[in-house]
Amino acid sequence: MNVVICGINGAMGRVLHEEIKTYDNINLIGSLSPRSGRFGQDIDGMPDVVIDFSNTANIDFLIEYATKNKCALLICTTGFSDEDKAKIKEAGKAIPVLLSSNTSLGINVFRKILKSISAELSTFDINIVEKH
């Protein structure tokens, strides 16, 4: 499987990059890094999937890139507007698209813990603040 990562310089992008190195059948063929100024110019081959850990500002480019290359798009970014979500849904008619925000291990473990203890804390007023 040929993978392209957008947001490879962020925390999750770096983790995924290191994980990919441990598999013989998954190849990182390039990255899309908006800050580099070379957005998508160094891709070596045809991607099977683009995995996005960047930010909402890149969604138009990512949809265009994935559609043009007829590859799947896994979006792991939060904060999309209703208009962005409509674009993502429309892209799903042409290519496989999965919008799965907060894919980090920590968030998923946290969600599991919250589910298991929420009944015990039903009388508590709890606030959760997300910080990057």
Give a label for each model feature:
Residues M1-V4:
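Extreme N-terminal starter segment of soluble prokaryotic enzymes
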Residues C6-H17:
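N-terminal Rossmann NAD(P)H-binding glycine-rich loop of SDR-like oxidoreductase domains
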Residues E19-G40:
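NAD(P)-binding Rossmann-fold cofactor-contacting core
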Residues L28, L73-L74, V97-L99:
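Hydrophobic beta-strand scaffold residues
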Residues I43, F53-C76, D82-E90:
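Rossmann-fold NAD(P) dinucleotide-binding segment
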Residues G45-M46, V50, A94:
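Alpha-helix C-terminal capping/helix-to-coil transition sites in glycosyltransferase folds
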Residues E64, T77-V97, L105-I117:
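Rossmann-fold NAD(P)-binding glycine/threonine-rich loop
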Residues V109-I113, I117-K131:
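Conserved anion/nucleotide-ligand pocket segment
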